[in-house]
């Protein structure tokens, strides 16, 4: 009886301590006197997100809508972790551009010693990130992007081969654009061709195989413990494959040092400030990590929207074929520069279906919000709700409408720079954004130059997002009717 009594008292004591710690964690914003969304016990303000019943963007959109205009930012909780949600575009501009030196960290988990491929620009912070960023800057130059365009155009010809003479057939658009982007990643990042791409495609589908939202959250909340326990962000067989391929391709490149520049491995290896081989492998993996899913979703969503607006699709195709005709049928830098309306179509897709619904920053030093009494403390995690900004009716009239004219030069200049951030921007923006845009444009040229798309009986309207993903990805594959057409 005494043992049972002591056990019960111990259990109650432990529960009391846990309860007190949870209440203390969820009282952070109240203690600081900061406007905040009242949290629920344990879940904070993201109930249903971890379980996949609700998308993170829905939770952020609700907070943004409820508090915008009341303060420059609002506090909220992701489970027990306090976050700042930036509400005011002036504050967003300061965080991204003018005062980016106060927010040089993303606050993501990385463990280069235990997981070498996490040594990439996306995950690193501090001195390691600054050093790597400086070395990467000379790789992602306009001149190098131009050198890679020829190979990119060659890869896009697969789209035409896959589509062929198809006439009024329903095809899986998600698979089609996924094959193109995977070939780009395999070839441009790793230098793979032919049969090697098949195995590469398999591993690009499997590196998230062991991903669990709650494990990622714990690694974000307790990074030191995660490193001690050797927590892995990605499936080990997949990272072992990517590391092995990158290192073997680097050795192959050095034996063929007269080969024309066609891959990022070569560009990094030939840089004036070279990286170690394992660092180069990390960047190649980061290229896949940051780019493959968002680029697949963007091209699929773009065709989905064009299928629903045939007049916009026809205008885009007309511009593409006119530019190709003026440049001998070749996709050249000059040809891409002439695709002004096509770029507007892509930008409107990125606005309406923003792949990264939020940007993460962590304050590396205290920041006083100008013109207010508010202070963002060192160590505070800041979240910029890009998708909510892109869908704000105060910035974009009738935001649910797909309307490429929003990105005409005059309309674009009338909005603040922070009103459109599909790839992030500023100091910690996507360093490969220029190449990503080039990859999307070249893919869209190949998709539209000889084929027309329309909704079919298998097209899900409206499109739904996958609640299990942090990115805005389609819940199911996008399928459309396709037919070959003559030039308009």
From Swiss-Prot:
Binding-site list for heme: 430
Key word Heme present: yes
Recorded topology in the membrane: Peripheral membrane protein
Keyword set includes Heme: yes
One Pfam family cited in the UniProt record for this chain: p450
CDD domains with a match to the protein in the record: CYP6-like
Enzyme Commission code: 1.14.-.-
Entries under SUPFAM superfamilies matching the protein: Cytochrome P450 (SSF48264)
GO molecular function (one): heme binding
Catalytic class of the enzyme: oxidoreductase
Signal peptide: none
GO CC terms: endoplasmic reticulum membrane
Cofactor(s) listed in the protein's UniProt record: heme
Keywords: Endoplasmic reticulum, Heme, Iron, Membrane, Metal-binding, Microsome, Monooxygenase, Oxidoreductase
Main location: endoplasmic reticulum
PANTHER family named among the record's database cross-references: CYTOCHROME P450 (PTHR24292), CYTOCHROME P450 6A16, ISOFORM B-RELATED (PTHR24292:SF100)
Protein family per UniProt: Belongs to the cytochrome P450 family.
Function: May be involved in the metabolism of insect hormones and in the breakdown of synthetic insecticides.
Protein name, UniProt field: Probable cytochrome P450 6u1
Annotated source species: Drosophila melanogaster (Fruit fly)
Organism taxonomic ancestry: Eukaryota, Metazoa, Ecdysozoa, Arthropoda, Hexapoda
